[in-house]
A protein has these predicted regions:
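Alpha-helical transmembrane segments of multipass membrane proteins
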Residues: 34-38, 42, 61-65, 97-101, ...
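Membrane-helix interface/capping segments
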Residues: 71-85
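Transmembrane alpha-helical insertion/packing segments
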Residues: 2-75
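Individual transmembrane alpha-helix segments
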Residues: 145-172
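Functional transmembrane-helix hotspots
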Residues: 103-134
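Membrane-interface capping segments at transmembrane-helix boundaries
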Residues: 74, 182-184
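Short membrane-interface loop/juxtamembrane segments of multi-pass integral membrane proteins
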Residues: 128-155
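Alpha-helical transmembrane segments of multi-pass membrane proteins
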Residues: 22, 26, 30, 88-97
Length: 184
C-alpha cells in the first residue's frame, strides 16, 4: 500500500490593495495615541508621566500588532496574506506606534517643563541607587559612577529614544511569531 500523497496548497497569496498600509496606519496610530494619552493622563494626575507606569499603555502595542495581523488574514480570505504582508503589517504597526509614542514623550517633556523632567531624573536615580544597594558586589565602582552620571545627564532625547525602543521591542516581540503563525 502506497503512502497517500498530499496535494500542494495552490491558493494564491493575495492581499486586498492597500490593506497592509491601512491596517498598520489604523492600529499603529491608535496604539501610539493611547500611549501618549496615558502619559499625559499620568502627568495631569500628579504621577510621573515618564516613569514605569507608562508600561501599562505600552502593553497595548503588542495587542494592536496582533489585531492588525488578524484582520489582515481575515481580509485576505479565502486567500492567504503571505509572510511578507503579515510581518509587514505587524512591523509597520509597531514602528508607527513607537514613533508616535516617542514624539509624545518629547511633547510632554516640553509641555510639562523642566521640573517634571528633573523629577523623573530624581526618581530614576533613586531606582538605580536602590538596585545598587540590593546587590553591591555585582557592579564595579566605576560602572556605578558611570550609571549615576548617565542618569544625572539624561536628556529629553534620551527619554524619547528609550520610549521608542521600549514600544518597538514590545511590538516586535509578538509581531514576528504571530506574523509567521497567521501567514497561512
Amino acid at each position: 500500500m502506497a503512502a497517500p500523497t498530499r496535494e500542494p496548497d495552490t491558493r494564491e497569496v493575495k492581499v486586498p490593495a492597500g490593506a497592509v498600509k491601512q491596517l498598520a496606519l489604523r492600529f499603529g496610530f491608535g496604539a501610539g495615541c493611547a500611549c501618549v494619552l496615558w502619559m499625559v493622563g499620568l502627568q495631569r494626575t500628579g504621577s510621573n508621566g515618564f516613569g514605569p507606569k507608562q508600561i501599562l499603555a505600552q502593553l497595548l502595542v503588542p495587542l494592536a500588532v496582533v489585531a492588525s495581523q488578524w484582520l489582515l488574514r481575515k481580509a485576505a480570505k479565502p486567500n492567504k496574506p503571505g509572510l511578507g504582508a503579515s510581518l509587514g503589517v505587524g512591523v509597520f504597526t509597531a514602528l508607527l506606534a513607537a514613533s508616535i509614542s516617542a514624539v509624545g514623550t518629547v511633547g510632554l517633556a516640553y509641555g510639562a517643563g523642566e521640573p517634571a523632567v528633573a523629577q523623573h531624573r530624581a526618581e530614576v536615580l533613586e531606582i538605580v541607587k536602590a538596585q545598587q544597594r540590593e546587590n553591591p558586589k555585582a557592579v564595579a565602582s566605576s560602572a556605578v559612577q558611570q550609571q549615576v552620571a548617565q542618569v544625572q545627564h539624561m536628556t529629553v532625547g534620551n527619554m524619547a529614544t528609550s520610549n521608542f525602543l521600549q514600544v518597538l521591542v514590545l511590538g516586535l516581540v509578538l509581531a514576528v511569531p504571530v506574523g509567521i503563525f497567521l501567514r497561512e
